[in-house]
Amino acid sequence: MKEVGSSYLSFEKKLDVKSLRQLVKQETGLQVRRMDSFTLIALLAVYRAKGDIELSAKSGLYSCADYFSSDSMQSMLIDVHQNNPIKPLSFVASVGNAANYYIANTYAIDGPNIFIGSSKQAIEKNKLLAETDMSLGLIEHAILLVWQEDENQRECWAKIIQDDGFFGERGVV
């Protein structure tokens, strides 16, 4: 695998969604209505990392963030704990899955689309997933995203990696 693009964004949390939406729209030209800050910062990070890179039809999206305490995610986790079926709208509305949906749709990513929750070694976990899919010939490009938030900042790292020919048809050459 070789890294072909990357970006890092950091915004103060006090930056309101409307201002962030305007910034993303001005820089990217994307229609970004009704999106949360989490999704907006990722769209911009991917846009900057991608630059002029032409993603192949065989691309995947691998993202990671700390588990969020949004109502939808909490409701979904409670349902799982109580052995109740997950409500489709709860799953779709969870922050990470919603962000991945918009990113994949915006950048025409039709391959694997995975969001994991983890606070440690996030980029390494994403890379391992992407390496596995590359070794199986499922993808040629991968977008790796990592979000972090604290009480003051929102941060997002985006990396674009591509298969450098190291993987053969049946795994590592």
Residue ranges and their predicted role:
Residues M1-V173:
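Conserved "HGTGT" condensation-loop signature of ketosynthase/thiolase-family condensing enzymes
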